[in-house]
Amino acid sequence: MSTVQLVAVHGNGGGAARFARLPAELPHDVALHAPTLPGFGGRPLGDVDGVAGLAAALREEVVALPRPRVLLGHGIGGSVALELLSSEPDLVDGLVLHAPVGTRLDTRWFPRLLRPRWVRRAVQVGISSPVLRPLWRRTIVRDVPAPFDAQFLAAYADAEAFGAMFDWLTATWFDGLPVLPDLPATILWGEDDRVLGADQRADYRRLLPRADERTVPGWGHFPMLSDPHAYGEVVAGVARTLVRRASEPGTGREAS
């Protein structure tokens, strides 16, 4: 098997920095590419005005790589990956959705809380504030060691698109996503994830009928920061498996 090109798509917040500990933990046959999307990590949002614009920026990164390619979407990164593949599912050989954000946006309490723009700004400032860091260390990043926890939280201050994501990702958007019947996929979740409930997996199975599921004991929401060695082992193994599944006879993807 050729080297698997693993494109890791970050969630809302600080951009690709959440994957900074991962390259050293991946085997030689899996190469990590972690682009920072427009509006995150200090990258200007520019004229991007929706999830489709983020997906277009991601597409440029993906098509520049040789095959086989696997997308790994974490949080809203999963939504951006789904948006991209909704029109071009053959761009990649597999998809890993790790605790994706996208479903139940009209019923979950956090997206509803952040409907007012002033609340979004207050939350963004609060997450990045050093004053509230002890609180977040007991909740959001409770398993992430120093100094990575502080770096991750501080990066929210530079997320120009943070608030806009709550306008762009809606229940209507999610309901309009097509089923991807031939795409090899894995839905990955941490057993101790306190940010997103694993019961949401069923909503993604509807979109990805070829998906399998994996729940990892001991993982919270950010295992790429809290335990990069274990995370690297798991995502590398999953990526290899998806590439093998994509090349199986009769899948319609073996010539991709």
Labelled PLM ranges:
Residues 24, 33-72, 233:
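Active-site loop/oxyanion-hole signature of alpha/beta-hydrolase fold enzymes
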Residues 73, 77, 81:
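Gly/Ala-rich beta-loop-alpha elbow adjacent to hydrolase catalytic centers
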Residues 126-180:
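Conserved alpha/beta-hydrolase catalytic His-Asp/Glu region
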Residues 216-232:
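Catalytic histidine-centered segment of alpha/beta-hydrolase-like enzymes
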Residues 166-206, 215:
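Conserved serine/cysteine hydrolase catalytic core
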Residues 2-44:
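Conserved HGGG/HGGXW glycine-rich cap/lid loop of the alpha/beta-hydrolase fold
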Residues 86, 92-123:
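Flexible "cap/lid" loop of the alpha/beta hydrolase fold
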Residues 7-11, 74, 189:
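The conserved beta1-alpha1 loop
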